[in-house]
A protein has these predicted regions:
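N-terminal glycine-rich phosphate-binding loop and ensuing alpha1 helix
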Residues: 2-96
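Hydrophobic packing residues within well-ordered alpha-helices of enzyme cores
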Residues: 46, 95-99, 224, 272
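A structural signal for short hydrophobic beta-strand segments in well-ordered beta-sheet cores
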Residues: 59, 188-191, 252
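Catalytic-core segments of class I nucleotidyltransferases/pyrophosphorylases
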Residues: 141, 148, 153-169, 181-183, ...
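Short, well-ordered beta-strand micro-motif
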Residues: 61, 83-84, 190, 215-217, ...
């Protein structure tokens, strides 16, 4: 089974070049970039924890006093990024209460509120472009803070910027950060003419998977204006990614699967708490 999955991986993925940037290049990019925190979603599978505290899941206080949003901001801050915008709707005030204006973290945080109704990540970015909290002249990194980067060796922001700039040199407008696959959550079987020949517990399925982090160049903003409005809830991944892929203008940067934790249920939250206590 593993050999078959390896062949499948080779058929759908080939890596790009290894990218490197200088300290000066990183600083220049960071100074001309806004990091958008997508913190407007409801987080229904963690509703028991969030509703009891009237708190957005990315603002939940971990036992060490931290939050998912705070961890994400510090990761980018330590790489030189200073300008952030939180795209808020559900339990917006809880996010504002935790993050404030960012001064206690050494950064600047603006807020862009979804207009009256949730509009998804596509609409939220369109709204932030319209209200000026994402300047159209600046680069943009969109990070969903419930997609936590953990156990990463080196600087995650530096590496994704290096990968993005390599893609820009090839005419790309955006870079999707991915892992090389995800564990299958069930018992896998190899079957021949009805006979089970092999069992693989929780096999690793080698399909490149987006980790909720995307880097955009300013030239991508016209797509948000054309594709999204503020009348319905739409995430940009389902609409914009296929179009950019068709045009061959979407690049990728791959990180190890062990460095991504999608915190969307109580089990994943408990895992984050465990890992955070070891840092």
């Amino acid at each position: 089974m593993k050999a078959a999955l390896d062949n499948f991986r080779d058929a759908i993925y080939s890596p790009g070049e290894i990218a490197h940037i200088s300290d000066t290049e990183l600083q220049q990019f960071a100074e001309n970039c806004v990091v958008a925190l997508a913190v407007g979603g409801e987080g229904s599978r963690l509703k028991a924890a969030t509703e009891s505290q009237q708190t957005h899941k990315t603002a939940l206080r971990l036992p060490n006093g931290d939050s998912m949003a705070g961890r994400t901001i510090r990761m980018f801050r330590d790489a030189g990024f200073r300008d952030f915008v939180a795209l808020v709707f559900h339990h917006a005030q809880s996010v504002i209460d935790v993050l404030g204006d960012g001064s206690h973290l050494g950064v600047r945080i603006a807020y862009s509120h979804d207009p009256e109704r949730p509009v998804g990540r596509g609409g939220a970015i369109r709204n932030a472009l319209d209200n000026g909290s994402i300047p159209r002249t600046k680069n943009l990194i969109v990070h969903n803070p419930d997609d936590q980067i953990i156990r990463y060796e080196g600087s995650f922001p530096r590496d994704i910027v290096a990968g993005h700039l390599l893609g820009v040199q090839r005419g790309m407008l955006a870079t999707a950060v991915v892992v090389d696959g995800t564990p299958y959550t069930y018992t896998g079987m190899k079957i021949d003419h009805g006979v089970v020949e092999q069992i693989e517990m929780y096999p690793y399925i080698p399909i490149p998977t987006h980790v909720g982090v995307t880097v955009f160049s300013p030239k991508a903003y016209d797509y948000f204006t054309k594709l999204f409005d503020l009348t319905k809830k739409v995430d940009f991944e389902s609409v914009l990614f296929p179009l950019l892929a068709q045009e061959r203008r979407l690049y990728s940067f791959m990180i190890p699967g062990r460095c991504w934790l999608s915190v969307n249920d109580p089990k994943a939250l408990a895992r984050l708490i465990e890992l955070a206590q070891k840092e």
